[in-house]
Amino acid sequence: MKQKIGLFILYYLRFFAKLQLKKNKNCKIIGITGSAGKSSTRNAIYSVLKNKYLVKASFKANSESGISLDILGLEMNNYSILDWLRVLILAPLRLLTYFKKFDYYIVEMGIDSPNPPKNMDFLLSIVQPKMAVFLNANLNHSFAFDQLVADTDPVLRKDKLVKAIAKEKAKLILSLPKNGFAFLNFDDANVKETCQETKGLVYSFGSNNLCDLQITKHQTQ
């Protein structure tokens, strides 16, 4: 029963979030995925665009519930039952009261599982980016992917787990339209592979001098 209620809430919020997005029908959505670096990338893109365009960014919202809430301009306070009731009541009202305009929506798209609603397919049912950034894939949030790998050898298991995670994240890139743009980290072999499958135009970045954007120096903070 608890699971059914949870799914109802997600579908409910998604319904109103998609209606809300239609108010900005000319908005270009930029999706960002990867096991690490999503927030930094979001901040960098936001800094570049904000002085010339109206930009909305999904701060602290990259999940199956967080993205819908962010689109509706709603935030959870303490995730109590009363808090959920509050956002459920406010969601339809936002269609009448929330008219924020933006040219770009930068959204982090984090996945924890190959299964809905915590997978990329569900996030893509909320937003359909025209531009996407795929940063990397590693074992962060890998628990739900364990069932996909039968190998017990630690090295083989790790490699296959990372590939399974990358495959799920890559759905963002594969969903792009022909007039879409994919920005791929060619330093990550699993990310680089997706360039052969996407319909969109690919721009590469990385340390190799053959990349469209070569990174020659970086600083870790």
Label every PLM stretch briefly.
Residues M1-F16:
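N-terminal pre-Walker A segment at the start of P-loop NTPase domains
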Residues R14-S65, N77, P154-V155:
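Walker A (P-loop) phosphate-binding motif
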Residues K25-C27, K101-F102, I106, L124-Q221:
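Acidic, Mg2+-coordinating active-site environments of NTP-dependent enzymes
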Residues Y46-N51, L69-L72, S125, Q196:
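Short, well-ordered alpha-helices that flank and scaffold nucleotide-derived cofactor binding pockets
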Residues D70-S80:
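Conserved NTP-binding/hydrolysis module of P-loop NTPases
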Residues L88-Y98:
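Conserved alpha-helical scaffold flanking the Walker A/P-loop in AAA+ ATPase domains
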Residues D103-P117:
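Switch II (G3) loop of P-loop NTPases
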Residues P114-M120, F143-D146:
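Conserved ATPase-coupling elements of RecA-like P-loop NTPase cores
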